[in-house]
């Protein structure tokens, strides 16, 4: 809770962070320049509502994506994953126009989208790891945000929270090919410890609602079904279209202005 994706972690407070740093030391025989962390999120209410510009809420949890990293001034990105066998390696100046089809598409997309607005000259070497099984907690958004935060730090780029959210969303929409809304990115960037995020995805106004002192203690249970999935290649985009069609029909039958379906 409470950690910002843009903040360098000075002390390695969890086993996952420590494992990431140890692997970096073993690989590169040096200390990392920093560790970028982005939490996973849970969504009590709002799934499939954000891409229809509705109101959602969410919580960040104290598990997520860690990247132990150091600068590479030759412009190379070289990232090993503790969760996937293949190492990502590419030049920041030569990102393919189309996705390749592996987990590193999230990194390539982050460079491509960020480079449209800012000069990216410094790459990075590092180790990335994700606590908990992949899928269901917005790990893809967390990978993009934690990587983008590290890349920004090394290239002296400062992003506001809203800009980071929108850029990370563009990576998923325009490069990876997932027609997601902004629920995942907003929860992972805006949430704070002991607060519930309430967000209107139409106008981006939000409120962080603190836990009431009179509220009884609670715990959040997350169950793993044994199945791992990726939104890419799933029927997520079709579900988004179905929600859009349903909302359009409801507006029409209720007598409201419904305009053109494409809008």
Q: Which positions does each model-derived feature cover?
A:
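C-terminal nucleotide
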Residues: 1-45, 53, 66-100, 195-263
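Acidic, glycine-rich active-site loops and adjacent beta-strand->loop/helix elements
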Residues: 41-42, 73, 83-86, 128-134, ...
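DPxDG-like acidic metal-binding loop motif
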Residues: 60, 137-157
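Helix-rich "cap/lid" substructures immediately adjacent to catalytic or cofactor-binding pockets
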Residues: 98-132
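Phosphate-handling active-site elements
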Residues: 116-125, 151-167
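Alpha/beta catalytic cores of group-transfer enzymes, especially the acyltransferase/condensing modules
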Residues: 158-206
């Amino acid at each position: 809770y409470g950690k910002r994706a843009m903040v360098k972690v000075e002390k390695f407070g969890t086993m996952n962070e420590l494992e990431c740093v140890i692997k970096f030391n073993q690989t590169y025989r040096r200390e990392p320049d920093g560790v970028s962390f982005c939490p996973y999120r849970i969504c009590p209410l709002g799934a499939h509502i954000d891409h229809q510009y509705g109101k959602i809420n969410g919580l960040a949890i104290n598990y997520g994506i860690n990247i132990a990293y150091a600068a590479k001034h030759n412009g190379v990105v070289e990232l090993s994953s503790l969760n996937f066998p293949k190492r990502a390696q590419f030049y920041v100046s030569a990102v393919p126009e189309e996705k390749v089809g592996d987990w590193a598409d999230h990194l390539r997309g982050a460079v491509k989208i960020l480079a449209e607005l800012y000069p990216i000259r410094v790459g990075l070497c590092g180790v990335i790891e994700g606590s908990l099984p992949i899928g269901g907690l917005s790990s893809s958004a967390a990978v993009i945000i934690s990587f983008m935060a590290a890349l920004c730090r090394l290239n002296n780029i400062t992003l506001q929270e809203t800009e980071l959210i929108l850029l990370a969303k563009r990576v998923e929409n325009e490069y990876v090919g997932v027609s997601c809304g902004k629920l995942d990115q907003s929860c992972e960037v805006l949430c704070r410890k002991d607060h519930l995020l309430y967000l209107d995805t139409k106008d981006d106004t939000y409120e962080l609602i603190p836990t009431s002192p009179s509220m009884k203690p609670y715990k959040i249970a997350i169950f793993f079904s044994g199945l791992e999935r990726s939104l890419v290649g799933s029927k997520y985009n079709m579900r988004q279209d179905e929600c859009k069609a349903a909302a359009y029909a409801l507006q029409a039958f209720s007598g409201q202005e419904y305009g053109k379906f494409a809008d």
